[in-house]
Amino acid sequence: MGVKLEVFRMSLYLTFPVVMFWISNQAEWFEDYVVQRKRELWPREKEGQRQELEEFKQKIRKQKEERLLQAAQQSS
């Protein structure tokens, strides 16, 4: 009984990773599960959203510059 159990366990240890690699490398599976899940988690950006972000970054940079200029003028 012990030898048969060890043979079964060893065959299970060897076949499980091989089967998992085979399944995960299937193109249809990858498209259905991985790419679709990625699109759900991180949807594509809208055009206006990127422009709003750039405007916000410029606004923050301008405020930082103004604070630095005020600090430089006060220290002089």
From Swiss-Prot:
Keyword presence, Metal-binding: no
UniProt keywords, alphabetically: Membrane, Mitochondrion, Mitochondrion inner membrane, Transit peptide, Transmembrane, Transmembrane helix
Residue ranges crossing the lipid bilayer per the database entry: 7-24
Subcellular location: Membrane; Mitochondrion; Mitochondrion inner membrane
Recorded topology in the membrane: Single-pass membrane protein
One of the GO BP terms on file: mitochondrial cytochrome c oxidase assembly
Major subcellular site: membrane
GO cellular component annotations of the record: mitochondrial inner membrane
Pfam family, one: Pet100
Function of the molecule: Plays a role in mitochondrial complex IV assembly.
Recorded family membership: Belongs to the PET100 family.
Subunit structure: Interacts with COX7A2.
Protein name according to UniProt: Protein PET100 homolog, mitochondrial
Protein source organism: Mus musculus (Mouse)
Gene field: Pet100
